[in-house]
Amino acid sequence: MERPLENGDESPDSQGHATDWRFAVCSFRDAWEEEEPASQMHVKDPGPPRPPAGATQDEELQGSPLSRKFQLPPAADESGDAQRGTVESSSVLSEGPGPSGVESLLCPMSSHLSLAQGESDTPGVGLVGDPGPSRAMPSGLSPGALDSDPVGLGDPLSEISKLLEAAPSGSGLPKPADCLLAQDLCWELLASGMATLPGTRDVQGRAVLLLCAHSPAWLQSECSSQELIRLLLYLRSIPRPEVQALGLTVLVDARICAPSSSLFSGLSQLQEAAPGAVYQVLLVGSTLLKEVPSGLQLEQLPSQSLLTHIPTAGLPTSLGGGLPYCHQAWLDFRRRLEALLQNCQAACALLQGAIESVKAVPQPMEPGEVGQLLQQTEVLMQQVLDSPWLAWLQCQGGRELTWLKQEVPEVTLSPDYRTAMDKADELYDRVDGLLHQLTLQSNQRIQALELVQTLEARESGLHQIEVWLQQVGWPALEEAGEPSLDMLLQAQGSFQELYQVAQEQVRQGEKFLQPLTGWEAAELDPPGARFLALRAQLTEFSRALAQRCQRLADAERLFQLFREALTWAEEGQRVLAELEQERPGVVLQQLQLHWTRHPDLPPAHFRKMWALATGLGSEAIRQECRWAWARCQDTWLALDQKLEASLKLPPVGSTASLCVSQVPAAPAHPPLRKAYSFDRNLGQSLSEPACHCHHAATIAACRRPEAGGGALPQASPTVPPPGSSDPRSLNRLQLVLAEMVATEREYVRALEYTMENYFPELDRPDVPQGLRGQRAHLFGNLEKLRDFHCHFFLRELEACTRHPPRVAYAFLRHRVQFGMYALYSKNKPRSDALMSSYGHTFFKDKQQALGDHLDLASYLLKPIQRMGKYALLLQELARACGGPTQELSALREAQSLVHFQLRHGNDLLAMDAIQGCDVNLKEQGQLVRQDEFVVRTGRHKSVRRIFLFEELLLFSKPRHGPTGVDTFAYKRSFKMADLGLTECCGNSNLRFEIWFRRRKARDTFVLQASSLAIKQAWTADISHLLWRQAVHNKEVRMAEMVSMGVGNKAFRDIAPSEEAINDRTVNYVLKCREVRSRASIAVAPFDHDSLYLGASNSLPGDPASCSVLGSLNLHLYRDPALLGLRCPLYPSFPEEAALEAEAELGGQPSLTAEDSEISSQCPSASGSSGSDSSCVSGQALGRGLEDLPCV
């Protein structure tokens, strides 16, 4: 494109702006703020003055900053009008060069800028001088400039070129009155001062037009009626529109001479051209008019009466007022202001057209179009930024604004000054904003095109990757149907080869598509969106590849677990086949040898196996898992039956040779027995001590080791059930168990009945709005309960018919699954609310259709009733069992479990009602208890609701709401690790004391319970937690010592001795409260091994004193003989519910495998969610599966 310069040179600022437009947005406002304010100039010389007519062209352009850029050729006739074709710096761009084709027609606009006089849709945008067809266009801005551009432009620019060629270069139409500029007027008339607008306002706020009757310009030849009316219209257009609407007050100064006739004729024409333009004419002077012009309201006034119409402060000094006015300063201000406004308006129109043009550029549909559109956009932006208006504004715009804002009283005191400057600032800021918008939009457009162009250069490589994904990658990851374990194992070899190639393909594709980071599909063209789709496909393939790799690794791990389980089962079957015809003594020895070499698989083995099978998501693999578990279970049961058969009493003395070792006399405190009992069928009584001791030794020789191996424990004499020989007692046990099994079957049928008939009702289209999506809240975890009882618990109850007391182990083994009843109880109030609001009415039709006399609410109450039934039946079994036997202890533990779950649901509801708590209660372990106490601290007494967690003791203040719902305001909490307990405090049996280590003696809390039972339960639970913490701390210290190289040998006594630590007790009454430790609690030495807090009674011989250090005997904690009721009798493998996540019921804790693992680390608690697998003796397959969740 040919540059609009005369000699080929260009402004450095213009060049910099044009070449740096893609990376920096030129802000004219910033440029103006950085410029030094222009030096104060005399008001009569604000800038290069306009030369009079007849001056040479060189004189006109001398001193103009743009004189070397734009020079208009003289007209052919060299008339005065042609001489006015060249102007000074303030108006050269307005009168001289018009916009070129691209600058004025960058997009199909409704109108375009032209050089024709009066052709403009925007006020003040016309860039013409005096009318006449002789005005010429600079060659650099002619339409022919586009013809010389070698760049092939797209359709928008072609349309621009066509429109430009059809645009006329001039027009003789008159300019609208509101678009007149100073350059459109006769300079001699404007500069003469015959008509001025000094900024005066009359008393009614009208603008005052001052006409000097004594001005010689009224007699000049240039003062034609046309020029006069143009001058008056121009002056009228300067005030604000609201002031123009009031009309002008024309003040005629006729004090020296009478006004000429042309003055009043001009006013009459002004009134005709713009009705209401002249409100009144005030004639100041003593001259009397012979004829009053028509259409004008004329009033002759003496100079003294003028103040009644115009205030003194508004009158110019020439009329005796106080308003300073200099016509030359006013002229300079108007010329510079109008030049700035013209360039801003032209630049705004240009930039708006360019923005629309960039938006109108078509999207590239073919790869070859990207380069053409990119070059077209760059040329478009280059031409826009090379436009003379932007160049002038960049070079002089800031200086012009600075000059216009100089404090010149002759100009700034006029009310029209602020209006003009506000308009100038607005237009200047608009140019700045439009340029910023255009630059950002164009840069983003060009960057997107360049990005697509870069990716097109890599098209071949990306196409190869895409083809590989479609033909090789994705088909290789697909699985035909539901895979089996063998199929997954066979796929490992081919997958390793695929994995290496796939990683290379993904890496190469990500390297190619790296420039797409941060781009969205809406910001790119269709070719770019295609590359984005390829990147998304690569990301998805990488994820699928990683999942496939993990899936095959899980399959391999699962195969190893399968192989270990099957190997264990096959070895057991082999031993059983060999012992088929052997004598009982040989059977016992061989079984002992077998369990020594092949200990039972730990529960974690089957948990991991089921987790992997569930993660693989194949029913066939899960079926294989069930088959392996069933085979192991059958083997374990066969071995157990073989052991029981071999333990039947032979004739006296016949098994003496089988005794491995003699057992010493029983200690004063006999330890608890294993979870299973081998002497239940012996039928011996306490009157047969010799035989009993002999048989105990035999059992000790045949007892199974732990899952991880280890030495065999010593046996202890057991006491057979006293009522085992009583037929009536056995009959009673059988009857109670039969009732339990029968009611269990009815309970399972009721749960299935509810699910089959009422669950589908919520899928009906007419379900009430309040019940939509409320299945989990209405029914709770009823489906999980049904699965547990139907698939597991009912079967185990039925298997206990041979020995009814074993029912207790079924409860204890599934303590985690019974935790679902606490969640069900917690959700029950919400379920009842839904039933009362919507359920009774909605489900009534279904009840009538079924012909059932029980409604849904009755069936939803059955789980709560069933737990109460369990408690009664277990109580009956305990009464029938009688005596302090192992089975009796297990039954009591099961009772405690049931009672705890019944209470725990209410405890969870109370925990949810705690408000303002800044402690995460989910991280504090199981909620054990919550009750209301009277708390005394010093002299202060208050009522507090206290919550006991495994890791925290929380105090809250009960608040009773108006609706009867209690809430609890959080007050304080203490870590259990810092707590100490004094079980008896004061004279009352209802009080106990809580104190803290490393604190002052007065920092204690005395808690008074409402009943003795509550007090005993709380002290027992707290004691249990403190014992467990003491044991845990001891183990941690031992582990730390081993890791530091201290105590690298096992701590074991070679032989029993009176000097051994375990035979000593330390009884020391502390004399100072500050030195008490957390072990100073009144608790049985082995009570920490109980399964449920507050469940077991104190053993005989327990210390009963308060704040006394008893025999901790921590070295016996891991003695297998003390683990008692940890080992279940029958294995139970949790199927689909083992590791499936349960949907939380309104924030209820879900029973997942992870929760079971966490809770299983705490073997405690009457509300414990599980048992510590490390504390389980691992007697048989699944014997520790009581901590597996069933949900």
From Swiss-Prot:
Residues 1159-1176 have a biased composition (Low complexity). Expressed in kidney, Leydig cells in the testis, epithelial cells in the prostate gland and Langerhans islet in the pancreas. Isoform 1 and isoform 3 are strongly expressed in Purkinje cells and to a lower extent in other neurons (at protein level). Widely expressed at low levels. More strongly expressed in testis and pancreas. One of its GO terms (biological process) is regulation of small GTPase mediated signal transduction. GO terms for cellular component: cytoplasm; cytosol; extrinsic component of membrane; plasma membrane. The keyword Repeat does not apply. InterPro entries: CRAL-TRIO_dom_sf, DBL_dom_sf, DH_dom, PH-like_dom_sf, PH_domain, Rho_GEF_signaling-related, SOS1_NGEF_PH. Keywords: Guanine-nucleotide releasing factor, Phosphoprotein. Residues 1-152, 707-728, 1150-1176 are annotated as: Disordered. Residues 920-1027 form the PH domain. This is Puratrophin-1. It comes from Homo sapiens (Human). The gene is PLEKHG4.
